[in-house]
């Protein structure tokens, strides 16, 4: 079979070569691209004859999928798969597997990096030092003793809840599927409205679905404390950026730490959050630790090997 890795996976070629070696030894044709395709025509030229495509976060449209007559499997080096035309895959009987769990620690840790950056004024402090300034006006506040709301308690949300408790926070959670383990640790599951109203921090950890798109809109933001901080390391469209920026600029929300946007960075300079007060922005890097990238490469190659062996894993239903 022809296996095409249509974009780089962010790890050293030594790891790629080691992971590809068993597939090549079994007679499979393996192609690895070290840069993203710059347009859809070039992308199609890469993948059109593939039996298996491996990708990270570059969108894969129905048009591209349907133009690949031999395509049987996608191994996605990401947790979310909202950038892939899943309906087209289902219609064609193409198996889709993801890299479940690879970035749990990385995303959870950056969530708190963003939180602390916002509440302790890390970015303004850095600028002040470089400008030979003082600490005047840069008094922050602590995580300890605050109420930390976690929206979505999958693997990442659960890890965030445990870290919040370790910081001395009272932890609230909202999820369709409460976790007994978290409840045993003192996490209290509540309605989304109660979480929004009671939390000093609201941290988002839900996939992008029809139900979660625009979940945090103007109405939801209005239910939050004016002293609260919103954290989004999930998916950009879960939040209405215009409504969030307006609330921040009008003082109806204290701050925000945002890693994800409506599309992949670079984001336009005129994006509303680029001009919002008390906001720390990062260019979708929550997943991007060396450890996480190495782990996801292992997972997506294992997905292929397991499928070839007739025992697929990490299957997206």
Predicted regions and their residues:
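Phosphate-binding beta-alpha-beta segment of Rossmann-like dinucleotide-binding domains, i.e.
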Residues: 92-94, 100-147, 159-162, 166, ...
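Rossmann-like dinucleotide-binding domain for NAD(H)/NADP(H)
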Residues: 96-97, 227-317
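Rossmann-like adenosine-cofactor binding region
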Residues: 62-65, 177-272
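Structural signal for repeat-unit boundaries in curved repeat scaffolds
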Residues: 47, 68-71, 196
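Glycine-rich Rossmann-fold phosphate-binding loop(s) that bind the pyrophosphate
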Residues: 153-154
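N-terminal glycine-/charge-rich "phosphate-binding" loop or analogous flexible N-terminal tail
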Residues: 1-50, 172
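Glycine-rich, N-terminal phosphate-binding loop of Rossmann-like dinucleotide-binding domains
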Residues: 7, 55-57, 78, 204-206, ...
């Amino acid at each position: 079979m022809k296996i095409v890795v249509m974009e780089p996976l962010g790890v050293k070629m030594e790891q790629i070569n080691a992971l590809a070696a068993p597939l090549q030894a079994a007679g499979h044709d393996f192609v690895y691209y070290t840069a993203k395709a710059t347009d859809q025509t070039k992308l199609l030229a890469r993948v059109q004859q593939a039996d298996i495509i491996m990708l990270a976060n570059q969108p894969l449209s129905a048009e591209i999928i349907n133009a690949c007559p031999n395509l049987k499997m996608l191994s996605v080096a990401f947790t979310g798969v909202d950038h892939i035309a899943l309906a087209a895959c289902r219609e064609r009987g193409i198996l889709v597997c993801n890299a479940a769990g690879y970035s749990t620690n990385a995303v959870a840790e950056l969530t708190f990096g963003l939180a602390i950056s916002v509440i302790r004024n890390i970015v303004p402090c850095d600028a002040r030092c470089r400008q030979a300034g003082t600490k005047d006006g840069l008094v922050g506040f602590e995580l300890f003793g605050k109420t930390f709301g976690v929206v979505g308690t999958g693997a990442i949300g659960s890890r965030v809840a445990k870290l919040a408790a370790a910081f001395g926070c009272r932890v609230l959670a909202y999820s369709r599927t409460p976790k007994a383990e978290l409840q045993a640790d003192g996490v209290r599951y509540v309605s989304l409205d109660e979480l929004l109203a009671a939390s000093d921090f609201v941290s988002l950890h839900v996939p992008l679905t029809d139900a979660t798109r625009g979940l945090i809109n103007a109405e939801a933001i209005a239910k939050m404390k004016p002293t609260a901080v919103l954290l989004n390391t999930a998916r950009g469209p879960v939040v209405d950026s215009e409504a969030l920026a307006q609330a921040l600029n009008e003082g109806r929300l204290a701050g925000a730490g945002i890693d994800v946007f409506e599309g992949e960075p670079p984001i336009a300079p005129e994006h509303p959050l680029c001009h919002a007060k008390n906001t720390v922005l990062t260019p979708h890097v929550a997943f991007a630790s060396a450890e996480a990238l190495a782990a996801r490469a292992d997972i997506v190659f294992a997905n292929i090997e397991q499928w070839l062996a007739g025992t697929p894993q990490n299957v997206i239903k």
